[in-house]
A protein has these predicted regions:
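NUDIX/MutT-family hydrolases
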Residues: 85, 94-125
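Generic C-terminal helix-cap and adjacent flexible tail
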Residues: 1-2, 126-132
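Active-site-adjacent beta-strand/loop module that shapes the phosphate/pyrophosphate-binding cleft
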Residues: 13, 60, 70-92, 102
Length: 132
């Protein structure tokens, strides 16, 4: 089975809300996800995440602590997703690849249809946010 390794950012505002982005393409169109993308060969998860947020959202983030690494089997590939707490350093999270976005608090985090691998991390993300 093909293996894909990605990094994803849980971008957290000062008020504890987190940023979610909605896919506008492909098999999982209209599902929600934490922004990020594939690691290039020899690239660290943190560097990949910084690069992907710059490419997808025209913004700079500070990558913080690892919240969880999800291992998930999609029908066509195995995904390893490293999910990091992050904060916005500059930019306005301009959507360059996604169709929609929203800020969610702990109470509303379950109100969107997450990608299956992202869904696997929701409990850990909630626990992380409760500790802030």
């Amino acid at each position: 089975m093909k293996r894909v390794e990605v990094a994803a950012a849980v971008i957290i505002r000062e008020d504890g809300f987190i940023f979610a982005a909605q896919r506008g393409y492909g098999e999982f169109k209209d599902y929600w996800e934490f922004p990020g993308g594939k690691l290039e060969e020899g690239e660290s998860a943190g560097c990949a995440l910084t690069r992907e947020i710059r490419e997808e959202l025209d913004s700079e983030i500070e990558v913080g602590s690892l919240i969880k690494t999800v291992e998930y089997d999609y029908p066509a590939f195995h995904l390893t997703m490293h999910i990091y707490a992050s904060t916005l350093v500059s930019g306005s999270l301009k959507l360059l690849e996604h169709e929609n976005s929203m800020w969610l608090d702990i109470a509303s985090i379950d109100s969107v249809k997450w990608l299956p691998a992202d869904e696997e991390a929701i409990a850990d993300i909630k626990a992380y946010l409760f500790r802030l």
